[in-house]
C-alpha cells in the first residue's frame, strides 16, 4: 500500500472512531475535525500519530480542536 493510501486509511479510521466516541455521524465528525484543524493535524503529524494508540490520537484531536474553538 502506498504512503498516500495509508494516510487516507488512517484519517478515515480516526474520523470514524471520533464519530463513535462522540456519538455523532461520520459526516459531522469529518466536518468538525476539518473546521477545527483536526484533519490538517492528522496530515501534518501522521508520522508520529499513526504510531500511537487510537485512544491517544482521539485525545490529541479533542485537545487540538478545543484549542481552535471546538466544543466536543
Where are these regions (language model features)?
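C-terminal alpha-helical interaction appendages
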Residues: 1-72
